[in-house]
Structures are given as structure tokens and as C-alpha cells.
């Protein structure tokens, strides 16, 4: 009989493993309490979802024991780790004249997968493992001027997900630094602007 280590965000998880005797009785012991499992008769056994009580976050020792009709006993031990903590991911609003900008933000889990969604399209980002994530320059298609909704989602190995949203504003219109230019009127029609016409 066998059981692999498990990492999950389900605090009452189903458990499954292998058993080489289709008639053996299988019992799963979690934190010192026995739970009868089902021998499926196909080389696997199952402890149904929600059979276990709610388990606290952290590692739990699991021992599975199979007893055949002759009284022979086999067992295996594994660890089920419960992780219901959400990753923390963030992205700030950004205004830029780059139509295919790089994006970066913070992530508290160096093992989480990070995906950036811009205008409804997903783009895999890089978790740098140092508390930051990055979507490389020129990964995005050329974006039109104006605001774009950006959502960044992090998923940890246990399956917990968290999302943050921000606004990416593209502005490629040059600023009007000069302002309006007023040309004095040639009041006497001589083709020359004199001091009176210039207002000096």
C-alpha cells in the first residue's frame, strides 16, 4: 500500500493511493485518528473528500495501512500539508508613453505563478524570486492611447490565488509646452509692425 505526500488548500481533502490487493482492508490514520478508506479493487484506494475533519494549516502525518484476508499488514506514511494562505500580489497604476511597456510589481511567494491580464488577455509573467514579478518590455502588443485595465493574479503551489488590479494609461500625445502664439495686427497696413502695433 502506498501514499504520496500532498500539498493542498483543501482543509478536508480527499486522499488516494495504491494497494496491490483488491480485497485488502484499508485504513487511513491522520494525526492519530483512524478513518476507513475504500479499496476500489483496481489497484487504488480512496478516502472521500470531506471525510476528514477540518485540518489546520501545516503538515499532518498520514499513515495508510492495508490488511489482507490472511492478516498480512502493509503500511506507508506520508505528509499532507494544508496551506490556505493566499499569496499577496500587487501592481501600481502606471502612466507611460511606451505602448508596449514592461510591468512590475510585488509578490510575497517566490514559488507562485504570476499571470498578467491586460484588456482581457493573459500574459505569463516572471516571478523573480526576490519579492517582485516582471512582465518583460515588448511582451504586450502595441496599446492605444488611453486607460487599460490590468489584473495580476498569483497562484501558489497549493492552488491559492490572489488578484490585484490597476490602470495602465498610455499617453503618446506630446505636451503643448509653447501655448498659443498671438501675432500683432498691422494696423496701418504698411507691412511693418511698429512699436505702437507691438504694444511696446
PLM region descriptions:
Residues 2-11, 93-99, 185-200:
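Short, solvent-exposed loop/linker segments at the N-terminal edge
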Residues 18-25, 106-113:
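Short proline/glycine-enriched turn/loop motifs at strand-loop junctions of beta-rich domains
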Residues 43-50, 131-138:
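Short strand-edge motifs at loop-to-beta-strand transitions and within beta-strands
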Residues 51-59, 138-147:
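Surface-exposed, short loops/turns at beta-strand junctions within beta-sandwich domains
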Residues 69-75, 157-163:
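Short, exposed coil/turn segments at beta-strand boundaries within extracellular/luminal domains
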Residues 74-87, 164-184:
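Flexible, low-complexity linkers/stalks enriched in Thr/Pro that connect modular domains
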Amino acid at each position: 500500500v502506498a501514499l504520496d505526500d500532498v500539498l493542498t488548500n483543501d482543509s478536508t481533502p480527499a486522499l488516494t493511493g495504491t494497494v496491490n490487493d483488491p480485497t485488502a482492508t484499508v485504513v487511513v490514520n491522520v494525526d492519530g485518528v483512524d478513518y476507513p478508506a475504500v479499496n476500489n479493487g483496481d489497484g487504488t484506494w480512496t478516502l472521500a473528500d470531506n471525510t476528514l475533519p477540518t485540518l489546520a494549516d501545516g503538515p499532518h502525518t498520514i499513515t495508510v495501512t492495508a490488511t489482507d484476508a490472511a492478516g498480512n499488514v502493509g503500511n506507508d506514511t506520508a505528509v499532507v500539508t494544508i496551506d490556505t494562505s493566499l499569496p499577496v500580489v500587487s501592481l501600481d497604476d502606471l502612466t507611460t508613453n511606451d505602448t508596449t511597456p514592461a510591468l512590475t510589481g510585488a509578490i510575497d511567494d517566490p514559488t507562485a505563478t504570476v499571470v498578467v491580464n491586460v484588456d482581457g488577455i493573459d500574459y505569463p509573467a516572471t516571478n523573480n524570486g526576490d519579492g517582485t514579478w516582471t512582465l518583460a518590455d515588448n511582451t504586450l502588443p502595441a496599446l492605444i492611447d488611453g486607460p487599460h485595465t490590468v489584473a495580476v493574479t498569483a497562484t501558489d503551489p497549493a492552488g491559492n490565488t490572489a488578484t490585484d488590479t490597476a490602470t495602465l494609461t498610455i499617453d503618446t500625445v506630446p505636451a503643448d509646452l509653447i501655448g498659443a502664439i498671438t501675432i500683432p495686427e498691422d494696423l496701418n497696413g504698411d507691412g511693418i509692425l511698429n512699436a505702437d502695433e507691438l504694444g511696446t
